[in-house]
């Protein structure tokens, strides 16, 4: 059983938060050093609809920070010049239009507000009928204040909530929903900024496997985390057998090159490839990389591809972001 810890220390406008598994960095969130007009993932804004581009199958909108946003698949030409509510859905390079979406959820510690499924619904992890009945009774007087087009999902963390915690959480959600109103607006406006690192982690704390939380000044120095973080600036990741992988982010995709190093033995390629794919999921997560990923494996027999596919699937299985393995190219990667 791996030991899991959360390390938190003050940093910038908020905190730096690291998830450690067996003393290795497994996830990382760091707040900006200073306030900026950058819209981070999860920010909800009122945007002005500019134009629909048929060839791009989407619509461009104006955002509050003077950048353009892009909504994939949004084709309502009648909304041109209207103000609509969107959420920043992914990190986008500064020279590209920021990808936003009209479909989003608002998470809190015990509930999730959604615009796609009205009514009160429970997480599938809550199987105890008595728990559902207790929560339904507790929130029954508050549900009448929920807008008709809004659904509330009771998270699995509510199962162990103290009396009154779920209803207080729900009341805060309703207050937030009331803020998300673009009626009367004629210009883009930030309606709700995404939570900072510490708030984000503590919000999801009950649903994640955290064993220890350490929050103190200079905690990152005490656990040698800054050294691990500085290593992320290097594209090279060394493996225990002397091999290494090179991870480089381009504008189009993430390139991963696996090398055996000085080992030229018969089993070197397969062993290095297996070690590399086991490490890759962690490296992509702590580097904040995603999207299309192309892996150039060390020379590999076709008969061994099944082993690589299995290890890739296993390595990414616990990632909160679903990863699809598309297959092998004719070039062998």
Language-model-derived ranges and their functions:
Residues 76-79, 285-287:
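SF2 DExD/H RNA helicase N-terminal ATP-binding lobe
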Residues 1-39, 43-49, 81-252, 320-333:
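OB-fold/S1-family RNA-binding modules
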Residues 12, 44, 54-56, 65-68, ...:
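A generic structural motif
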Residues 67-68, 118-120, 159-160, 260-263, ...:
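A short, flexible beta-alpha/helix-coil linker loop
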Residues 21, 32, 63-67, 75, ...:
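A short beta-strand motif that forms part of the nucleic acid-binding face
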Residues 3, 57-61, 92-114, 173, ...:
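Conserved glycine-centered short motifs in functionally critical loops
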Residues 28-35, 60, 66-78, 122-126, ...:
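Beta-strand/loop nucleic-acid-binding surfaces
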Residues 55, 67-71, 75-78, 85-94:
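Long, basic N-terminal domains or extensions that often function
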């Amino acid at each position: 059983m791996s030991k899991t810890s959360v390390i938190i220390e003050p940093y910038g406008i908020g905190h730096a938060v690291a998830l450690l598994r067996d003393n290795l960095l497994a996830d990382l969130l760091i707040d900006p050093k200073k306030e900026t007009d950058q819209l981070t993932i999860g920010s909800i804004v009122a945007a002005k609809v500019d134009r629909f581009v048929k060839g791009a199958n989407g619509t461009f909108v104006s955002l509050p920070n003077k950048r353009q946003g892009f909504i994939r698949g949004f084709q309502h030409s009648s909304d041109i010049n209207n103000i609509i509510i969107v959420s920043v859905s992914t990190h986008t390079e500064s020279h590209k239009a920021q990808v936003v979406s009209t479909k989003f959820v608002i998470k809190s510690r015990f509930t999730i507000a959604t615009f796609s499924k009205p009514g009160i619904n429970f997480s599938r992890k809550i199987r105890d009928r008595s728990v559902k009945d207790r929560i339904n009774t507790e929130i029954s007087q508050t549900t009448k204040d929920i807008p008709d087009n809004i659904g509330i999902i009771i998270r699995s963390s509510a199962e162990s909530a103290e009396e009154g915690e779920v209803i207080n959480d729900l009341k805060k959600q309703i207050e937030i929903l009331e803020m998300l109103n673009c009626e009367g607006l004629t210009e883009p406006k930030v309606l709700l900024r995404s939570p900072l690192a510490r708030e984000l982690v503590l919000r999801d704390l009950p649903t994640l496997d955290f064993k220890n939380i350490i929050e103190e000044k200079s905690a990152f120095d005490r656990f040698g985390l800054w050294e691990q973080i500085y290593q992320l600036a290097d594209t090279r990741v060394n493996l225990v057998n002397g091999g290494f992988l090179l991870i480089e982010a381009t504008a189009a995709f993430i390139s991963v090159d696996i090398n055996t190093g000085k080992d030229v033995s018969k089993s070197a390629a397969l062993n290095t490839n297996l070690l590399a794919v086991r490490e890759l999921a962690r490296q992509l997560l702590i580097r904040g990389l995603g999207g299309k990923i192309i892996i150039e494996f060390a020379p590999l027999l076709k008969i061994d591809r099944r082993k690589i596919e299995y290890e890739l699937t296993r390595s990414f299985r616990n990632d909160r972001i679903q990863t699809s393995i598309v297959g092998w190219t004719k070039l062998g990667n």
